[in-house]
């Protein structure tokens, strides 16, 4: 191991060459600012929870950063990039197209499928820096509201029950 190699090098008074770590060059994150009007910037994120039978479920949340309006709360066991794309297309058909969508670096968001769809639709995907959820503060705050208002208080038996409750809460929240 590296400690033993280091010790032997020191005992033999050899010069130890320490390689510098290669750093990934990342793009600068988009600054978190309040948009001037609706539909300029949306934020999206996932949440995890369990049904009463301990099956893991995911919630996909989308909000408008201008007025924090909940645009979409979708629930399923697995939410791949194609599913995210379809959910966003439904919201766009209802609300119109945003200029930018802010998201984290999850596998669904960095997939080629979602990137090519966003490029085709002329929507910029703004990625936050890894390990800095505060750069996506609007959706993180919304996730906290979801968790403390209803998700942490109820046990749901099925996906249909959870989706129905989420949709009703979304209309009440807005």
List where the protein language model places each region.
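Charged DNA-binding/catalytic regions of mobile-element recombinases
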Residues: 1-174
């Amino acid at each position: 191991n590296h400690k033993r190699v280091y010790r032997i090098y020191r005992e033999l008074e050899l010069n130890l060459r320490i390689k510098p770590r290669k750093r990934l060059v990342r793009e600068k994150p988009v600054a978190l600012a309040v948009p001037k009007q609706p539909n300029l910037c949306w934020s999206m994120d996932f949440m995890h929870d369990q049904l009463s039978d301990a099956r893991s479920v995911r919630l996909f949340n989308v909000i408008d950063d201008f007025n924090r309006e909940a645009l979409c709360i979708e629930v399923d066991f697995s939410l791949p990039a194609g599913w995210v794309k379809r959910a966003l297309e439904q919201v766009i058909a209802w609300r119109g197209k945003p200029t930018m969508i802010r998201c984290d670096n999850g596998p669904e968001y960095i997939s080629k499928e979602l990137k090519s769809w966003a490029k085709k639709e002329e929507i910029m995907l703004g990625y936050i820096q890894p390990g800095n959820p505060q750069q996506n503060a609007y959706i993180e705050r919304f996730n906290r509201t979801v968790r403390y208002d209803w998700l942490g208080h109820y046990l749901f038996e099925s996906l249909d029950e959870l989706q129905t409750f989420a949709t009703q809460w979304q209309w009440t929240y807005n």
